[in-house]
Amino acid sequence: MKSAEIARRFLAFFEKNGHTVVPSASLIAEDPTLLLVNAGMVPFKPYFLGQRTPPYPRATSVQKCVRTIDIDEVGKTTRHASFFQMLGNFSFGDYFKEKAIPLAWELLTTSVADGGFGFDPERLWVTVYLDDDEAATIWREKVGLPEERIQRRGKADNFWSMGVPGPCGPCSEIYFDRGPEYGAEGGPVADEDRYLEVWNLVFMQFERGEGSGKEDYPILGELPSKNIDTGMGLERMAAILQGVDNIYETDTLGRILRRAAELTGTTYGENERADVSLRVIADHVRTATMLVADGVRPGNEKRGYVLRRILRRSIRNLRLLSGDESFHMHDLTAVAIDAMGDQYPELRADADKIHSIIDAEEKNFADTLRAGTTLFNRAVRRTKETGGTVFSGADAFQLHDTYGFPIDLTLEMAAEHGLKVDEETFHQLMQRQRETAKRDAQAKKLGNADISVYGNLLETGGPTEFLGYTDSESEARVLGIIVNGESTGAARKGDQVELVLDRTPFYAESGGQLADKGTITVDGRGVVDVEDVQKPIQGLFVHRGTVREGEVVVDDTVHAAIDTGRRASVSRSHSATHLIHSALRNTLGPSAGQAGSENQPGRLRFDFTSDKPLDATEIAQVEEEVNEVLARNIEVQYLETTLDEALRMGALAMFGEKYGNRVRVVDMTEYSRELCGGTHVAATGQLGLVKVLGESSVGSGVRRVEALVGLDALRRVSTESALVGQLSEQLKAPREELPQRIDSLVSRLRAAEKEIERLRAAQVLQAAGKLAESARDHGNSRVVTHRVEDGTTADDMRKLALDVRGRLGEDRPAVVAIAGVPSDRPVVVVAINKEAQQAGLKAGELVGVAARALGGGGGGRPDIAQGGGSDVTAIDTALRLVEQRVAGS
């Protein structure tokens, strides 16, 4: 029974029994405390907690889940998987144990012909909570299960709780006896390898109190309404019903695993190390496909990092098995989409998008590996040469900091060389870097003063009242003066000063908007030029500048005035940022979320999440859409409301940003609506013009758009027009023909480069004749081994091997082994003729001998194969081992 059919039968059975079928929720959890949905009941959690009224009394679903806690264990056993599907039925105060237990039994034991799963009742066991006599009685008297197949367990195994405090209750688990060949008799309490859990029925009837661990907490009392939450793992159920040993042999994971084996020239079940890699690949490719389909994008934080990590683990295991730098993820993703597509048709509909994102990450990681592996290999050699067994924490940090190697990748690679990593030093260096970055960020906010200085001013004078949304100047009272990091009563001409006022029109730098500049004037006595405004602690505005003339004293009444021209220019940039954000989301989809911004006078930059660059058409589309909104002169409106109400209105919030209960919404009449505390124009037409300069990468999965606004944009358009005119004159072509003229020049350049490449390859192949003449005899066989110059491509190595093999003829067995370092990893190619194959030699086996010496693997056809590894110092040894194998055959 296929996995899709198991899911269909489950839903159909419960729908027939009065349950509403609820589609799987996205893997991106609504619950802010969860990174990803990790259990079937997560979408229903608000109903169980009483936060929302359920729209139905009964529900059933097949929920997509990702568990991140044991990703490192995936592949090492056949039980662990990062993605799984949970079949469940739920009751919200409707039925309880008396119905949940018989329903489960009915579905399991009803024949396949009648819509059930056809389990033999004699092979089913159950466990109940130690004191749950009610459940035991239902199993015994209503279902008819013999007493000896009902086992009792304690709180740690058969009592479930949601949170602290929160609903909890006993559970009853149903197990399938796989037979004596899998272990000892005695039921689940004796052997959970033989007795597999297939279904867990949770009876939520109590509320728990504070306490640690699975057992040490009090029961506060019974819930007003009792609920049912059940969970059946689809993958495990599929393994049982399909008659296979484990989930990696089922119709979904098994397909991906078999294709991975084909692509890498390996056979599942022959080598445990290779089997682990194949299981990692199968699981992680499926998980990545499902995450991308639900809108997760590779990144360096939170769920984006989970996706990046599993993608990189699968890519690296693919390369370990294949021994080369081939790109296989596209092929495997296609298999995953097809394997899961019957259950989730959206995978096929979004196939192009899924491929694009995963392919881009594979390419990015290939570049990362290529750049960092040389340093890694050098560090490994240095460690081993000194007799060490621990990979340097400093080297691990450099790999992370310079090449983007996550620590888990370094741990895996080091373990393959029999080394541990000095994680303590690595984490110390990471912490030092974080502290340095934090100090640098705080230095701007704190200036020369200690945080306590600002704390005292806030405590005595209260928070600063911000008037800048409506006023560009105001009267204010000086609450505090700081010079050289110390509070003082006065500041005089020439002093670098920090002023704290009771109220201010000055905007303090925040939300990507630069601070206002201007003047603070003491009537008839002094002037301070304000160059920066910061909020070192929440609520306190600190004006930094220089006393230009006279003096300023605590308790002075001053006149604070901002530079209105600068404010207007910065406000135009900030409003343009909102418009660009909306245009990007309209062009790329909602995954193009804000990752950062900076709004300067006449100029802005906007960072957003995306896995691929914007092409010229997309940039033009964004620019045109923004300027069309400017032409409509949309009024910009502002609203202060609660966070919940703002989100209900559809206002965008920046992920990870901390908001108070009261927030400010900047609304550009349906086109753009965001939470924002910055300053903006009154209507979009005031921006004048927005010119997008281009886009670039600022990190993996994050792109940056830069743009000019207003007069700065107009000046750039004029400059570019003049530049086009100059090019037209130099290339002797009208403006409209410039693209064709430039294309022609580029084509000629590329043709010249190809000719250079052809000549270089020919130079490599010139050695073929001499190599054939240097063949060494081993019995009736001839062998040629040769190391090419570093930088010779793997393709040229294959051509050379085939050329030499052809020159050796077919009159007797001939073996050619060519090795080199195309970039930073060693590669070996073995080509043999038909006579050698008839003599029992196989190119794949010979490559395997060499690749293992290099610390990797490989495969290919019987007549030619390619492999590789990570140890460039072992190339000569690898070639010698190939020759020895031929000599001994």
UniProtKB/Swiss-Prot annotation:
Cofactor field: Zn(2+)
Subcellular location: Cytoplasm
Catalytic activity annotation: tRNA(Ala) + L-alanine + ATP = L-alanyl-tRNA(Ala) + AMP + diphosphate
Domain of life: Bacteria
Enzyme Commission number(s) of this protein: 6.1.1.7
Domain comment (free text): Consists of three domains; the N-terminal catalytic domain, the editing domain and the C-terminal C-Ala domain. The editing domain removes incorrectly charged amino acids, while the C-Ala domain, along with tRNA(Ala), serves as a bridge to cooperatively bring together the editing and aminoacylation centers thus stimulating deacylation of misacylated tRNAs.
Protein's recorded name: Alanine--tRNA ligase
